[in-house]
């Protein structure tokens, strides 16, 4: 409840700020299937171009509290880390073998919540072409909890005067439609991970075409 109330406070007070910083224009792969209104449990996946991808996602889906997995790099910062925890950020230490955050995600989903994940796991470095290879955590979580996946792609066009950020929301991926009973759990996780990455790549191309059209 606290995270929800704090989210609403930040969204209401921060709306004018995000408008000038991002001024996000939102497109849809198919609005009749997936809009900005998320009902029930879901896993939101996004490409990862900037630390500002999270607030863009937060304001893209304003009616829900997005519980994003966040790395130790930001969560260990004294002020920022506390602020992100208050918003509902889920601490993920990529340098350890502590997977307790997955149990926390499962609990949130069991209560109808929304988990946010950037499956690339980190920002691309100079010379790397995004999207990077996907980690398998999002696929594992979706399959074990039978949770629909909502894909989202952003162009990372933030803080640019007289330019807008652009986001496209894709149609949901139902993990049960992807899973093959003839495959092992590991193979199904790898298969769903490939499907998710292919979807993000496809949405990225679609977003590029839509922005050119205006």
Kindly give the residue locations of the regions a language model identified.
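Membrane-anchoring hydrophobic helices of lipid-metabolizing enzymes
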Residues: 1-43, 52-56, 86-89, 167, ...
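Catalytic core of membrane glycerolipid acyltransferases/transacylases, capturing the structured
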Residues: 36-96
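Structural motif corresponding to alpha-helix initiation and N-cap regions
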Residues: 26-29, 77, 99-102
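A conditional alpha-helix N-cap/helix-loop micro-motif detector
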Residues: 95-98, 131
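Residue-level "edge-of-site" marker
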Residues: 30, 97, 155
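Non-catalytic C-terminal accessory region of glycerolipid acyltransferases
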Residues: 2-5, 102-214
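Short, flexible active-site-adjacent loop segments at beta-strand->alpha-helix junctions, enriched
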Residues: 30, 48-49, 63, 72, ...
């Amino acid at each position: 409840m606290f995270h929800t109330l704090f989210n609403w406070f930040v969204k209401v007070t921060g709306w004018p700020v995000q408008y000038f910083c991002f001024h996000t224009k939102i497109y849809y792969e198919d609005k009749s299937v997936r809009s900005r209104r998320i009902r029930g449990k879901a896993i939101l996946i996004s490409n990862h171009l900037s630390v500002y991808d999270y607030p863009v996602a937060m304001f893209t889906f304003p009616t829900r509290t997005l519980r994003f997995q966040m790395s130790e790099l930001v969560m260990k910062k004294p002020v920022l880390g506390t602020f992100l925890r208050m918003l509902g950020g889920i601490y993920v230490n990529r340098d350890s073998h502590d997977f307790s955050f997955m149990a926390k995600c499962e609990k949130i989903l069991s209560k109808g919540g929304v988990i946010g994940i950037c499956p690339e796991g980190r920002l691309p470095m100079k010379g790397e072409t995004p999207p990077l290879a996907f980690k398998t955590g999002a696929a594992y979580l979706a399959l074990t909890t039978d949770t629909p996946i909502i894909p989202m792609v952003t162009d990372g066009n933030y803080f640019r005067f007289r330019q807008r950020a652009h986001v496209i929301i894709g149609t949901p991926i139902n993990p049960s439609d992807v899973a093959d009973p003839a495959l092992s759990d590991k193979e199904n996780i790898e298969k769903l991970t490939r499907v998710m990455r292919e979807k993000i790549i496809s949405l990225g191309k679609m977003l590029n075409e839509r922005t050119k059209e205006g």
